[in-house]
UniProtKB/Swiss-Prot annotation:
Disulfide bonds join 39-62, 48-67, 52-69. Keywords: Disulfide bond, Neurotoxin, Secreted, Signal, Toxin. This is Neurotoxin 213. Residues 1-22 form the signal peptide. It comes from Lychas mucronatus (Chinese swimming scorpion). Belongs to the long (3 C-C) scorpion toxin superfamily. Has the structural arrangement of an alpha-helix connected to antiparallel beta-sheets by disulfide bonds (CS-alpha/beta). The keyword Transcription regulation does not apply. Residues 24-88 form the LCN-type CS-alpha/beta domain. GO terms for cellular component: extracellular region.
Length: 94
């Protein structure tokens, strides 16, 4: 019985560690006005997906009344940072 309990505990712990270390990551994007994009829970998932597209990420949704973008790196959180980092126009960004 003790072996069974230890085995179950080990499986649960390894599963919890695996789930926490393999998260997709993401960020709340920041607008031109240096504020987060607000939304209504689950009603604005399409809006948030469009916002995330502006930040170079293909998927996002409304979470805790703000848009959340999956796999949005810290480098591209701000609207203009994404364009500076990815735009090839030397006249705008020397």
């Amino acid at each position: 019985m003790l072996k069974f309990i230890l085995t179950c505990t080990s499986v649960i712990l390894f599963t919890a560690v695996e789930d926490s270390s393999c998260g997709k990551g993401g960020n709340y994007p920041i607008s031109v006005y240096e504020s987060y994009y607000g939304c209504k829970l689950k009603l604005d998932d399409g809006y948030c997906k469009n916002i995330c597209g502006l930040h170079g990420v293909s998927y996002g949704y409304c979470y805790a009344s703000y848009c959340w973008c999956e796999k949005l790196s810290d480098r591209n959180v701000r609207y203009w940072d994404y364009h500076r980092n990815n735009c090839k126009n030397d006249l705008l960004y020397p």
